[in-house]
Amino acid sequence: MGGVTIRLFETEDFLGCAALAAQFRSELDALKGIVREPSLKRGEQELQDYLDANFFVYVACEAQKLLGFAVCRVDGGVVWLEAIFTSPAARRKGVASALFCEVERLAKGNGEPTVYNWVHPNNEKMLNFLAKRGYRVLNLIEVRKAYEGENLTQKIPVGEREFDY
């Protein structure tokens, strides 16, 4: 991982981080079957929403170039990972692991033994990433209306029930 630094977000990171957030949101949309080009405006709004809510935003950078980010919400001492993303060029180089370690440090600093994660059920990359760190899917079913343009093409069995997905 060489000269990669993990630090808290600074104001001058805004545009670079917003561009990464736009890519992140586009990739998450694809998991729901929604194809959208990354929108810098959407990324800026998402990042601003995190900042306005006083979420912790960590960035990974090397030679002043942003490689990725992680966003955490702390609720009653419990740390929730809201987002973690690395640019495609920075993947499989330990950048996301370094970001996640910083998030785990935040949780431990709050006296919590774990970070809570909200993961889309077919985000295999994230599920595998977390599994390597000892995290397991325990419980959680998202109940909401389908997004506009979202195609629910699968069924997921949970116990005696079957849910649209």
Segments (PLM) and residue ranges:
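Conserved GNAT acetyl-CoA-binding A-motif
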Residues: 107-119
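Terminal substrate-recognition subdomain of acyl/acetyltransferases
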Residues: 132, 136, 141-165
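Conserved acetyl-CoA-binding loop-helix of GNAT-fold acetyltransferases
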Residues: 86, 92-105, 128, 132
